[in-house]
């Protein structure tokens, strides 16, 4: 049997719309992500369980894990008779790369079970293709960090999909999911078709400056540049209480705060555990909207998708 865990991720990381993503893992050891197990069988079957299993499609054919199996068999020319089990621990429409978790775990498990017929580049391309069926377009800012780990910059040039960006080990990432759903497709549709020249210049300056600050080890500069002029001004209205949460996080010592992916999850960056705990406590008390919500203090997950057991 093969069992693969794929971690949650932050798409965009405020300054890198569709081109920057980061995998995260809670300090307390919680597996914040999906797991897919595969075992040999006489025929294909898919079973699902987990905290958020009720949010999955009602038919097997609509499930993205089934579609991963189907597409993997097409690409490799092999009809794999396997029993697949999806442990759906990630809320759908959360801004934590939920669909990427399922896709990455499923395809990485299939590839491992089949003897790794696809190299990492081809597998990542396939992950982007399958995740795009849910998000509405192919982009790698969730699947790349989920699969490869760490902070990843999407390049898609010279057959390079993404490359790692050095980040700061002292940074803690407070992740708060309020328990409501935001559709990625709807969150993309709310964005304007055109941006002003000033916003384009600011976006380029923030992203380039952030990458430069990461490579030159300037954490305060990197944090100061984490300002989103592309998505956050338009999406914040989809997140009840976001403006108050961002203001409170800053007052409690957060270096930066932004929307994770399309939301509604937000992240706050701290360089001190005491500040991170204070931010986490405030968010748990004021940002969560129901019992489905949660808050985790995380670090970047450098490992990405990995086999368990």
Curated annotation (Swiss-Prot):
Substrates-to-products reaction catalysed: L-homoserine + ATP = O-phospho-L-homoserine + ADP + H(+)
Its EC top class is: transferase
A Pfam family of the record is: GHMP_kinases_N
Q: What Enzyme Commission number does this protein have?
A: 2.7.1.39
Q: Which InterPro entries does the record associate with it?
A: GHMP_kinase_C_dom, GHMP_kinase_C_sf, GHMP_kinase_N_dom, GHMP_knse_ATP-bd_CS, Homoserine_kinase, Ribosomal_Su5_D2-typ_SF, Ribsml_uS5_D2-typ_fold_subgr
Entry's Gene Ontology cellular component terms = cytoplasm
**Role:** Catalyzes the ATP-dependent phosphorylation of L-homoserine to L-homoserine phosphate.
Named in its record, the pathway it takes part in is: Amino-acid biosynthesis; L-threonine biosynthesis; L-threonine from L-aspartate: step 4/5
Gene3D superfamilies in UniProt: 3.30.230.10, GHMP kinase, C-terminal domain
Q: Does the keyword Aminoacyl-tRNA synthetase apply?
A: no
**What are the protein's UniProt keywords?**
Amino-acid biosynthesis, ATP-binding, Cytoplasm, Kinase, Nucleotide-binding, Threonine biosynthesis, Transferase
This one is known as Homoserine kinase
Q: Where, in this chain's numbering, is ATP bound?
A: 91-101
Superkingdom in the source lineage = Bacteria
